[in-house]
A protein has these predicted regions:
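Non-cytosolic head/periplasmic domains of membrane-anchored proteins
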Residues: 85-168
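Extracytoplasmic/luminal low-complexity segments enriched in Pro/Gly and acidic/polar residues
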Residues: 169-176
Length: 176
């Protein structure tokens, strides 16, 4: 009975998602992680992104190995070489664990931008059909202009979104 209980508890711990890492670099992939920082699921934001996720076979890798595989892929390397901005967003249920993930992510991501999000934003981003990084941009943009939609945001690159945010921010500052 004890062996069954421990086995069930271990399986529950292994297969329960506790954090997510969103990688936006041309292709947009979201990694769902378990408490051991292993990839449980990889979701692409488009059919092409999902093809990349399937090709890379990231399931059950450590998230740092998965992140390195994503960044080292031909598709992402080409996008970065062509000036695409890298944005990595980390979300989790435990703030300290998120901080640890952020530190590891920053060392892997190098020159890209890294941010953290609340775990509740993972579900909200999925409902909007956006990556976590783009969802955070949507929230920032909507704070300045509530008429902005998730459809508009989904059609933009992270560079375009940052420029849009900058334009809105300077426009708001100029009017105050």
């Amino acid at each position: 009975l004890l062996v069954v209980f421990l086995g069930a508890g271990g399986a529950l711990a292994w297969f329960t998602p506790v954090s997510a890492v969103s990688v936006e670099a041309g292709p947009s992939l979201e990694l769902t992680l378990n408490r051991f920082d292993r990839v449980l699921q990889v979701q692409g934001n488009s059919a092409q992104d999902q093809e990349l996720a399937d090709k890379l076979e990231l399931s059950y890798l450590s998230y740092t190995d998965a992140l390195e595989a994503i960044l080292g892929s031909q598709e992402v390397s080409q996008a970065l070489d062509n000036g695409t901005e890298l944005a990595v967003t980390v979300a989790g249920q435990n703030q300290q664990h998120c901080q640890d993930l952020m530190e590891d992510t920053q060392s892997c991501a190098g020159h890209g931008s890294c941010s953290s999000a609340d775990w509740s934003q993972v579900t909200a981003a999925q409902k909007e059909g956006l990556s976590l990084s783009k969802y955070q941009m949507l929230l920032q943009l909507q704070a300045l202009d509530p008429s902005i939609t998730s459809e508009q945001v989904s059609e933009c690159s992270m560079h375009q979104l940052r420029q849009w945010l900058s334009d809105l921010s300077s426009g708001q500052d100029a009017s105050s």
